[in-house]
Design a protein with these regions (language model features):
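Bacterial Sec-dependent N-terminal signal peptides
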Residues: 1-2, 13-36
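Sec-dependent signal peptide recognition
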Residues: 2-8
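Hydrophobic loop/turn residues within beta-sheet-rich immunoglobulin-like superfamily modules
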Residues: 38, 47-49, 102-104
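Surface-exposed binding patches on compact interaction domains or structured appendages
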Residues: 46-96
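Short, hydrophobic beta-strand segments
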Residues: 95-105
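A short beta-strand micro-motif common to beta-rich folds, especially ectodomain repeats
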Residues: 106-120
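C-terminal edge beta-strand
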Residues: 120-131
Length: 131
């Protein structure tokens, strides 16, 4: 019985510490990036290196590929079967990334969320495009 209680307490202690290992920081990128409906490309330089970029659809549906992940040079996301956002970065320990945004022909605004991270630290960047 004592072993069970000790195991349970150890597990609770471990789980409670996980959140302390990951913290939100500012890598020097803007919190929100807005593109006109015509699209375009832009380079963003940060003030610290990062190891990966995760791309999320903030409002995924059953038909969406709501998550794309990459340690590689390019990572992209499909949104409603229309590839509109491409992220390019130099891989592990880079300090910049480039966004390619296709023209918006849907007539509606659209958005994605990027998480720039370095294992224990992350920054969230919202990418929006006018409709």
């Amino acid at each position: 019985m004592i072993k069970t209680v000790l195991c349970a307490l150890s597990l609770l202690l471990f789980v409670s510490c996980i959140g302390a290992w990951v913290r939100q920081v500012n890598f020097g990128f803007p919190e929100t990036i807005t593109f006109a409906k015509e699209g375009g490309e832009r380079v963003y330089n940060g003030n610290d290196s990062f190891s990966s970029i995760r791309v999320y659809n903030p409002e995924p549906t059953d038909n969406d590929n709501d998550f794309s992940y990459g340690y590689c040079e390019k990572t992209g996301v499909h949104y409603e079967a229309d590839r509109w956002l491409m992220v390019e970065f130099g891989g592990v320990l880079g300090d910049s990334f480039k966004l390619y945004v296709e023209p918006n022909t849907t007539g509606k605004p659209r958005q994605m969320k990027l998480t720039v991270d370095d294992i224990y630290e992350f920054q969230t960047v919202h990418v929006k495009q006018e409709g």
